[in-house]
């Protein structure tokens, strides 16, 4: 999941530059502090750098799995989709995402066990350990890297869109600045830094989304009044059903796809390898569906309720509905904070993809005789250039 391209850019929302600077500056400073903290107990080996010494307990594993999987789409894209489609988008996203916990639990324990057995840190390494086939390892690593690179390149583009909304400048400046920040703390502390910043980013995004929902619902006269107003109009009553949107076949096929595909995302697979124990994976899987509902409920409700205030938005405008609604009821500071919530969501995805893809290149595709630290750093820096460079081809 990722933010839409520039065709759906967030329009500048009237936030003063001074407010935006304070909000974004404070957030960036917090990320740097957490990276420095992680650096203090970082070992020199790949297991410490890529897997945090296989030390992730249940609560932190839950937080980092959720923060990694929920990108800027959770904040902006899902609210825009619910504006266009309605509440039927909620079970697709919340239940479908939560249902992945089944495969995370069943596969996750096996993944962790085989990872420890073979000293593997990536899926291709595990295949090599099981089969002894270097060709299979190279093939799988190549496929995973090629599949992840487009998604990795989109995150800086999404960051550029957010920065443009905050400051009104060109998108590429935001893309470069966010890329530099993410690379800085990822290089500094490896997975430990990424996990700790995930915790902060996840808390920021979730807290601000629920605060925004409470204010929007209160402004609409309560949830019952808002739903009654939507259902009483011929133009909006379809937003409360699924007719014409999600048939049983579409719904089931989507659930099956996510169930099997998502645990193979390199960044999620990496975290399963980094779990402290099977019990940690079990606790994570038990609570993951709850977190999925908590993450998707606010933006989807806000997007649907947005029809009451803005009934005729086009696709680009609908992707802007969440910060617009929250700014209407909370002013520029809260609107700016919600944009930072989206920034936090995309950064928690970007840093994880960067680190996981870097591990695939370093551990599976490159010569393992290369100097460890230098190889890791050069790979991550090279991968990070994909987002900014994509502007030259896609804008």
Regions found by a protein language model. Name each.
Residues 4-76, 186-189, 202, 208-211, ...:
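Membrane-interface "cap" regions at the ends of multi-pass membrane proteins
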